Amino acid sequence: ALLENAVEEGINFFDTADTYGDGFGEEILATVLGHKRNDIVIATKFGYDIYDPTPRDGHKERAQKFDKEFVKYACEQSLRRLGTDYIDLYQAHNIKLADLERDELFETLEQLQFEGKIRHYGVALGPDIGWVEEGEYTLTQRQVASAQVIYSIMEQDPAKRFIRLAEENEVGLLSRVPHASNTLTGEFDDGLPTFDADDHRAHRKNEWLEEAMKKVARVRFLVQEDTRTMAQSAIQFVLKQPSIISVLPNFTNLSELKEYTSALETPEISDEEQAKLDELWEHGFDVSEPEPQFREI
């Protein structure tokens, strides 16, 4: 129902991956939105071998494959699960530099594009530590349509350095995790939670959340009573960058969906607010200070 609600609220871009639920994420899109195929844009990802029957060790990363035969096979399987004959955006999932440097991969993607099975291709970079080289190489050396990155008020590096390169090379950036693991939604304002075992946040030490909430306290000036919530401010922050063409928030209920989609109707981040955010970022959000300190503007 939420996916149908999303379309009703004006959302037409849906991002998934073959590895989400071992294909279940793609199947859900087909089941719920298949009848609206011509009205929506579907992006999915490839690169992890979800077809290997070897049991996984906890949250250990799956083996990746980007050879010609695997990519073609993965594409066919995604098309089948999505119930469609074309994918709007096909993204190499968490691809490493060595695979980015292989021409065969991009020749394969161009062939899939020529055959009409995909319309555009790009990369989904991450996680947020250790993909500077991948991002810079992609944006300057490969003719991709898009690059998906993690970018938010709280997590700006290394995506911040990609913004100029994306604009110069006419690559659209897709920003995921705009609410920084929900620290910018108000979910944790009443105290530290206990995460379910299958929640990726449960595998971090509590210190990350304690520090994050100190940072959130420093940016509460963004909230405008009755006109812009913190969650909406977080979306406006991301969309202030012209090279970011879409933001990909997670939502789990209708209230969140309506709040996020209405973010575009709220006041944009002003230049003064942006200057304050830039200074806070430069100084680590002044988490050691009792109150945020700003230079005169």
Give, region by region, the residue ranges found by the protein language model:
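N-terminal binding-site loop/beta-alpha segment at the start of enzyme catalytic domains
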Residues: 1-44
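Acidic (Asp/Glu)-rich catalytic clusters
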Residues: 8, 31-41, 79-83, 107-113, ...
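Glycine-centered flexible beta-alpha turn that most often forms the glycine-rich phosphate-binding loop
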Residues: 14, 87, 121
